[in-house]
Amino acid sequence: MRRIRLTVSYDGTAYCGSQVQPNGVTIEEKLNEAVEKLTGEKSPVIFASRTDSGVHALGNIAVFDTEMRMTAEKFTFALNQRLPEDIRIRASEEVPADWHPRKQNCRKTYIYRIYNHKIPDPLLRLYSQFCYYDLDTEKMRQAVRCLTGEHDFNCFCSARSQAENTVRTIYGIEILEEAVPAGGKLITIRISGSGFLYNMVRIIAGTLLQIGSGIRPAEDMERILRARDRKNAGPVAGACGLTLASIEFQKELEDEVSAENEDWSYVLDQRELKAGKTVRAAYLTVYRCAERDYQELLTRLFHQNYRNGAACTYVRDLEKPGRLAPGQQYGFYMLEAAEGEYPWRAEDQGN
């Protein structure tokens, strides 16, 4: 059995999202039909990222399994012949049979477009959010500066989210502006991160629309982030303005991962995970952490290390060493005493 990875582009206007559901036509449904027509096999595709009804994609990633011996590159053209015109395969390649698009470290980039003018443009209506009020893009840029880095983004998450935790890392966010021939301006919010919560980008965009139009000050963004309360943020902006631009998968681990914000600061040493040893470990140093975040922080990092191949995680707390004790449970991981610079070791109790 072979596993084929697809880079998929689609106009989401006519679809009820990417994931198969009982009511409504979806991107996944059309891809499944095309794969079955081509291969004669029922092999459901798995998307790396799910998109909602009306949301578009330039570079979503999907995989499917097949016994067909066609060269991987030819699947691009063969599937496109069997897909509607608003869905296109941009590239296809073979990947290891155990490669799973949702279990990889990656960088996702979304773009959100806002058409700002007195009169809507019919040519932009399906791919941008229309805004009548004049928007101050400089205030919008000021507002997003606090969002970069690792934070708890619970305030920008809809209630229907099934996420285990609401901490994400934003690598970069920029707001661009360009003139439109028909008049007005097209504002593009480009945001890259380790992952995004349900409706996260659209709620950030909805909050920025309020800031740009003067309904609330730019300083509100940081207050919203700190409060961690969805009620404080703006509305969910329209789906038509959102496009999943790309998903880039990490080829190798970084030597160190660190994070610093008002609530926590840590450094995670991953060099041993890259060394290819039979028994590999990661080394976590906690410099400071608010009590409300401590349990979740350690649980999340222990699980991240395990997923990246660590047999255990050695940990030290330089702020309050007494917070760690033998037998403490962090999800599936239990602390036991260790020797040396890192006095504690966490191992998965499920194995």
Predicted segments, located by residue:
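Active-site/acyl-donor-binding loops of N-acyltransferases
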Residues: A239-F249, S265-Q295, T299-N351
